[in-house]
């Protein structure tokens, strides 16, 4: 038992030998002194180094003409600011030295520059808006016409040159009258008036009484067949298939008789064509202003010359 105790006690120097081999005897172990150097700080001892951020770069504002731009901090100021920063924290020194006064001066200068620039920009915008309101108010309020609203387009007075009488050509155009009815016999007045018609479907289809009858009685199919079967380019039988004066009259009527067995609506074409002629005559009789007499004498009516009026304004 004693031998084991001696061997157990002798093992400690053997373990401590390699740890202390690089250090002379009598020197203290730094790991033993480390817990003595660390100090625990309380909440009262902890305080902020600086309250504001030194990096203050405001929005760029254009300087006014009368103001000089504030000088930017030079390299010397930056160097002073870097030197003015506190040193890194060490465990043996809990208190830190205050910042350099040059850094605080540069910080105050930059803040004042930003505030002065923002004030100048607000003054400029306020002055420009007030000047615009002043100009608009003066333009609307100036003059006696500001309170009056124009609702009707003003009409210009007629000039004496615009009130000219009819020329001799216009008067002589309707000078020839019929001896029996007394109506004008000029070409414009005696021309027959057709029934009204109009273009529909974006001016692609003509809507007229004749086209309504052609499509309603299936005569358009007969016209298309005659057009494709005709060898003569000058043959107009496709335009008027029921004509008796054109060539191939018997052939056309025979073909229409055979087609009427399959298209019974072709039998309504001739009665519809007669009704169209009757309506055309009635419309022409009502709307034609000229003479409709076939054999009548023409009388030339002389229009008395009227001296031109004097359209001068009374004084």
Swiss-Prot record:
This protein's record includes keyword Cytoplasm: yes
Ranges of biased composition (kind: Pro residues): 88-100
Compositional bias per record (Low complexity), positions renumbered to this chain: 109-140
Renumbered residue ranges of the record's region Required for interaction with CAV1: 118-315
Keywords: Cell membrane, Cell projection, Cytoplasm, Cytoskeleton, Developmental protein, Membrane, Microtubule
Post-translational modification: Cleaved at Pro-144 by the prolyl endopeptidase FAP (seprase) activity (in vitro).
Pfam families recorded: Sprouty
Domain spans labelled SPR: 177-291
Comp. bias intervals (Basic and acidic residues): 20-32
Molecular function GO terms recorded: protein kinase binding; protein serine/threonine kinase activator activity; protein serine/threonine kinase inhibitor activity; ubiquitin-protein transferase inhibitor activity
Record region (Disordered): 1-38, 51-140
Assembly information from the UniProt record: Forms heterodimers with SPRY1. Forms a tripartite complex containing GAB1, METTL13 and SPRY2. Within the complex interacts with METTL13. Interacts with RAF1. Interacts (via C-terminus) with TESK1 (via C-terminus); the interaction disrupts SPRY2 interaction with GRB2, potentially via disruption of SPRY2 serine dephosphorylation. Interacts with PPP2R1A/PP2A-A and PPP2CA/PP2A-C; the interaction with PPP2CA/PP2A-C is inhibited by interaction with TESK1, possibly by vesicular sequestration of SPRY2.
Comment on protein domains: The Cys-rich domain is responsible for the localization of the protein to the membrane ruffles.
Family: Belongs to the sprouty family.
Function of the molecule: Antagonist of fibroblast growth factor (FGF) pathways via inhibition of FGF-mediated phosphorylation of ERK1/2. Thereby acts as an antagonist of FGF-induced retinal lens fiber differentiation, may inhibit limb bud outgrowth and may negatively modulate respiratory organogenesis. Inhibits TGFB-induced epithelial-to-mesenchymal transition in retinal lens epithelial cells. Inhibits CBL/C-CBL-mediated EGFR ubiquitination.
Designated name of the protein: Protein sprouty homolog 2
Name of the gene encoding the protein in the UniProt record: SPRY2
